[in-house]
Amino acid sequence: MYINFPNINPIIFSIGSFKAHWYGFMYLISFMFAVWYGKKSVEKKNQIKINIENLLYIIFISSCIGGRIGYIIFYNFSYFSQNILCSLHIWEGGMSFHGGLIGAIIAMYYLSLKQNVKILKISDFIVPLVPFGLGAGRLGNFINSELFGRIAPNFPYAFLFPNTYKEDLKIVSKNPELQDILDKYGVLPRHPSQLYEFFLEGIFLFFIIYFFTRKKRNTGSISALFLISYGILRIISEFFREPDPQIGLLKNIITMGQILSIPMIIIGVLYVNLFIK
């Protein structure tokens, strides 16, 4: 009835103490693809006069740093404040998109000053490349069997993730009717929310931006579309994603991801109404 989580080793290979993880490999592939697509876009549209590799490298590094810091602050500050060295274990997962966005904005602001280019021109160029990283990150989450979805006992294509037992016990203690399912399968069936987000925030968002950018747009409109679209898609996907156990549902209603996405939508809508005519 349900789908067993595929037996995927999160480590691709190891040489001595060095271990290559799928999670990091996904981001590497997305970066390489973004460089290729970015060069192709510049050649076709002649958007900006900045070295593409340097631009993407700086923004990529800044977004990774921001993503890690954002995760620490927004999602698990109490743990990392007591385990500071664990903050460096990026290969184990634990990145915040919203933190990464802040890091990318800081990098773009720096580059805009250094290269004397409007920051919105840089962001309009970068935005179509972002879904590559988002999609890659979600596939990495799936391989790591992390950020799994909420329980879905009535969904025949729900996944049986191998590392949800502790959380499932807490759920069964409050919902004893699920005990039989837990006894039979060992874990509770859940939505593969990582795959939902891969399709929504990766593939679907890419095509939204792709078709929008086929025509010449006012400066900032592509960035505004991204803020609005991602914010909406993230809020939707969060309804299928298990809230982080250390936070849960804030006020028993809303997730941290949804809270952080609301300002994105507001800023995008305000920019469209105030500056794009």
Curated annotation (Swiss-Prot):
Pathway: Protein modification; lipoprotein biosynthesis (diacylglyceryl transfer). GO terms for biological process: lipoprotein biosynthetic process. It is an enzyme of class 2 (transferase). Keywords: Cell inner membrane, Cell membrane, Membrane, Transferase, Transmembrane, Transmembrane helix. Its main location: membrane. GO terms for cellular component: plasma membrane. It is found in: Cell inner membrane. GO terms for molecular function: phosphatidylglycerol-prolipoprotein diacylglyceryl transferase activity. Pfam families: LGT (PF01790). A 1,2-diacyl-sn-glycero-3-phospho-(1'-sn-glycerol) binds at residue 138. It is a multi-pass membrane protein. The chain crosses the membrane at residues 11-31, 55-75, 93-113, 117-137, 192-212, 220-240, 256-276. Its EC number is 2.5.1.145. Belongs to the Lgt family. Catalyzes the transfer of the diacylglyceryl group from phosphatidylglycerol to the sulfhydryl group of the N-terminal cysteine of a prolipoprotein, the first step in the formation of mature lipoproteins. NCBIfam families: lgt (TIGR00544). HAMAP family: Lgt. This is Phosphatidylglycerol--prolipoprotein diacylglyceryl transferase. It comes from Buchnera aphidicola subsp. Schizaphis graminum (strain Sg). The lineage of its organism: Bacteria, Pseudomonadati, Pseudomonadota, Gammaproteobacteria, Enterobacterales.
